[in-house]
Amino acid sequence: VELGCGNGRFAVSSAVRQPGWDHLAVDILPMVIRYATRRGNQRGLTNVRFLVCGGSEFLRDYFADGSIHQLHIYHPQPYREAGDEQKRLLSPEFLVLAHRRLVAGGEFYFQTDNPAYWSYFQKAVSPLFKITSTPDRWLEDPEGRTRREIVAKSQGLSIFRAVAEKVELDQSAYATYLQNAPAAEFDAMEAHPQRFANGHQVRRRQRGRRR
C-alpha cells in the first residue's frame, strides 16, 4: 500500500518487480491518479490499482487489522504554514492506525527531504515500530524513485529514508502511546528557511524575475 502515490512512478515500478504482490496506491488529486492508472494500464499490469482517497481514510475504511504487508509513504506534505500542523499525515493517531493495519512483522517504508519531518518520524514511531536498515535495492534503484525524490535530488537536498518494522504490542499499549507520543508540531521551515518564502521555493521565484 502506498499513500500519496503522486503519478504512480514507485507503485508501477514495484508492481513490475513484484508480480506476485498486489499493490494499492492512493492520492487526493484526481489528475495524478488518472496519470498513474494510465501508466499501469500501458504496461498491462493487473497487480496494481489506484484510487482517489486520503491516506488516513484509505487505511481506516478499506482495510482490516493485520491485512497489509508493506506500507509506503514517500515525501508526505510537511505543511509549512503556521496553523496547518494538524493536516500532517503522520500524527500519533495515524501511526496507531498504521500499526494496527499491518501484519505481524509488517514494514513501514518512509522517506522525506524535510529534516524536521525526519526528526519527528524517528521520535514518533517508537515504541510501535523498530527502525531497521534500508535495503540496498531501494537506495540504488532509479526506476523506483518517486518524482518528488528526483526533484529533491536535483535541488541538492538530502533524502532521509527508513524501514520500520512493526513491533508486537498489547492493545492496551495504544492508550499509553497516545498519551506520551509527540504531536506533529515541528517547524518544517526551520532546517532550510532560505528555500522558502511564503510557501514557495525561493529558487523558482528568482528564476522568474526579469533581468
Show the residue positions of the predicted features.
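Class I SAM-dependent methyltransferase "Motif I" SAM/SAH-binding loop
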Residues: 4-8
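Conserved SAM/SAH-binding beta-strand->alpha-helix loop
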Residues: 29
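Conserved SAM-binding loop
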Residues: 36
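S-adenosyl-L-methionine
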Residues: 40-65
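A short glycine-rich, Lys/Arg-flanked "PGG" loop and its adjoining helix->strand segment in the class I
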Residues: 90-104
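Conserved beta-strand signature within the Rossmann-like core of class I S-adenosyl-L-methionine
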Residues: 105-112
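SAM/dcSAM-binding transferase cores
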Residues: 133-211
